[in-house]
Amino acid sequence: MLERLIAFIDGARTSLDIAIYDAHLDDGAGARVVAALDAAEGRGVQVRAVYNDEHRRPIPVPPPPTGPSTLARLAAAVPSTAIPGIPDLMHNKYMVRDRDTVWTGSTNWTIDSWTGMENVIVVVPSADLATAFTEDFEQLWTRRRVEGSGGFDDDPASIAFDGEPLTVRALFAPGRGRAMGHLVARRIAGARTRLRICSPVLTSGPILSTLAEVLDDNRTDVLVTVDGPQMREVLAQWDRDGRAAWKRPLFERVRASGRLALKPSRPYQAGPPHDYMHAKVVVCDDIALTGSYNLSHSGEMNAENLLEVTSNPFSDACAGFCERVHARYAG
């Protein structure tokens, strides 16, 4: 994973914009990433970074970063802007290279993310998609806050994947956060042959209620995987907060369907290792949705991104990943 990250940075020729939530690497890996960024600047690449400014307020889902942070070294190496993580997180994990290629997904720059967690990275060679991500980055860069970013629509872009046409578009939260949740819910409702879901948690009301209805109707093949300890924490929060208690019966219907797998990850602790189920992927027939957005209510208010990809080969690859993860933790 480190080699892929460095190779992407090394491929930059004119510009590299980075939006990263969490960067906790050991000294060796951190030094190599910083060296790659220094080398990019040395060959004339304009490098910029925005990152989440860590804080002490407890956030059980997602768990807060821990251990030695690489963000300070990143900020010292390249022009950077810290985005306050209060009240909402700068939760993106993307790069835009040369205004024509996007790297995004669920993967932070941490050893745990690379070795202990299920995660997804998508690299899309598309100037049209890069334009949308650049617009989101510019909003974060200039405003220096999560609030007010992502409030625009992106037109679909077309590229080739595995010899077939692929259509992709992006949505960004918080500006389009509610639209993200409703889009995922609509795609779930429309699934006819297969529905595959990997997410740390399921707390979005529209998504959870639609999923429960699809399972009750038994009209498509469904497999769902979430993180066990994180969902238990969510259920405890719902029990304490009467305003969200209506969601518990919906989740119990999902659990009772027999289609749910819970990853028995290590409960949150201050130091490594961390091995959460961290991938964010939804496959509805030939449509795949993936990015940093984790199907949660809070995700609609964070700085997040979501790709909607229409492609049989790409959706097959995402479905295969979800099926392998589900098989690992089912039963």
Regions picked out by a protein language model, each given a short descriptive name:
Residues 1-6, 28-102, 107, 111-144, ...:
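PLD/PLD-like phosphodiesterase catalytic module centered on the HKD motif
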Residues 9-10, 97, 188-189:
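A short, aliphatic-rich alpha-helical micro-motif
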Residues 17-21:
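Acidic/histidine-rich, surface-exposed loop or edge segments in extracytoplasmic proteins
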Residues 150-159:
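Long, charged amphipathic helices and adjacent flexible linkers at domain junctions
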